[in-house]
């Protein structure tokens, strides 16, 4: 067992909640104690949904453990059916209730309800949230899609028909991605049969078999179900994720191939501004920027390709917290000449960010906190996220409009507009000088402690009695290295968002060579050394 302040994924029953909450006419009865009942908080506060999630808890207490908790569960199932009248129910246990082994599936079956009741076996101590969402959706599809049968040929003249699989509640920009992809498919002349889980009913899952093929937007949730539909009904499914201009064009070509139609109407009129913007913006702010990427596999891989191939960034880190897709992330990292980071420990991610010294961090809510602590620009590109990443505006990550949103997301944190003449103009300004630090970091100063002490002394009233000097405490740390005036002046010519790294590297270089004074020559030697 590991104690932590942060986890990238919850237990698997949270994934089941995401699927149940996304659908209509489905109810989830969860065998859980007091304390595991926080679904309302997740979906109404963080995602800002206007309805409570369809989840009923047994909420047994400590004193209930001395009597029949199985009877409590049966009562909760019967009461939920009588009150909500769902088309279907799923039943399971939370991570805590799993320990008492009450068999929710068998207990619900014994009630002989007049609706489908699908039991979920979600091993809370081996698997996590995304696996739980995938397993829940797979079980629902397997139970409700009907008996396996070969797919009939499409009638002449009928529009191609597809299902869109993967979007869930609490998903990162799933609502807006769905709008964008439906628009793309409509432009291609492809009709959408069912979208699931988001917005689907159990009856809709019975119509999945009618489609010609499936569009998988989020493999973490939908790949298992898509594999089953391919085996049971002969429905192929897409492998390309439409993130970025290149990814979207490949997606359109793949979908057109599955549907047997011409992709030209969409490819010729894509209208994305990302390609031109990335060519027209001053390359000083784009080409070669060092970027660290971490998130779920779908977004980490897709946006890594956008950053490297469409914006000219240099990828110095790529990782995921989802071990189910570690192979794909490792393959993508190898294509960029780096080693993938596969971990669900945020401290490992923070250590990797420190070691890589990137100029931009793209990650989850936790990487936002880490980057702020380290003074590095950051943008959120993957779940888990907090309330501010469920915006009221339209902000997809997929499709051609998603590529426009990604351009803004990736470029704006890099302090656009700070051309060299502006840096020179404001370098010594008392209000806007570079020692103030970026405004988005809450006024964090990048000045040295000596500078701050000098400024504090200048602000103190003249008649203030001198404060006694504190007794020095000796710490075992490298002695500070002195800088010559010429070297300090040259250092100030470096833009402030990379100056800290240049100072650190130069001082490390000088200490390793026992140089008491950093001169102009030392600065250039250090630059050449680390450049190699």
Swiss-Prot record:
The keyword tRNA-binding does not apply. SUPFAM superfamilies: Helical backbone' metal receptor. Binds 1 [4Fe-4S] cluster per heterodimer. The cluster is bound at the heterodimer interface by residues from both subunits. The keyword Iron-sulfur applies. GO terms for molecular function: 4 iron, 4 sulfur cluster binding; ATP binding; metal ion binding; oxidoreductase activity, acting on iron-sulfur proteins as donors; oxidoreductase activity, acting on the CH-CH group of donors, iron-sulfur protein as acceptor. The active site is at 282 (proton donor). GO terms for biological process: light-independent bacteriochlorophyll biosynthetic process; photosynthesis, dark reaction. [4Fe-4S] cluster binds at residue 36. Its EC number is 1.3.7.7. It catalyses: chlorophyllide a + oxidized 2[4Fe-4S]-[ferredoxin] + 2 ADP + 2 phosphate = protochlorophyllide a + reduced 2[4Fe-4S]-[ferredoxin] + 2 ATP + 2 H2O. It comes from the Bacteria. Keywords: 4Fe-4S, ATP-binding, Bacteriochlorophyll biosynthesis, Chlorophyll biosynthesis, Iron, Iron-sulfur, Metal-binding, Nucleotide-binding, Oxidoreductase, Photosynthesis. Pathway: Porphyrin-containing compound metabolism; bacteriochlorophyll biosynthesis (light-independent). Its cofactor is [4Fe-4S] cluster. Substrate binds at residues 417-418. Component of the dark-operative protochlorophyllide reductase (DPOR) that uses Mg-ATP and reduced ferredoxin to reduce ring D of protochlorophyllide (Pchlide) to form chlorophyllide a (Chlide). This reaction is light-independent. The NB-protein (BchN-BchB) is the catalytic component of the complex. Belongs to the ChlB/BchB/BchZ family. Protochlorophyllide reductase is composed of three subunits; BchL, BchN and BchB. Forms a heterotetramer of two BchB and two BchN subunits. HAMAP family: ChlB_BchB. This is Light-independent protochlorophyllide reductase subunit B. It comes from Methylobacterium radiotolerans (strain ATCC 27329 / DSM 1819 / JCM 2831 / NBRC 15690 / NCIMB 10815 / 0-1).
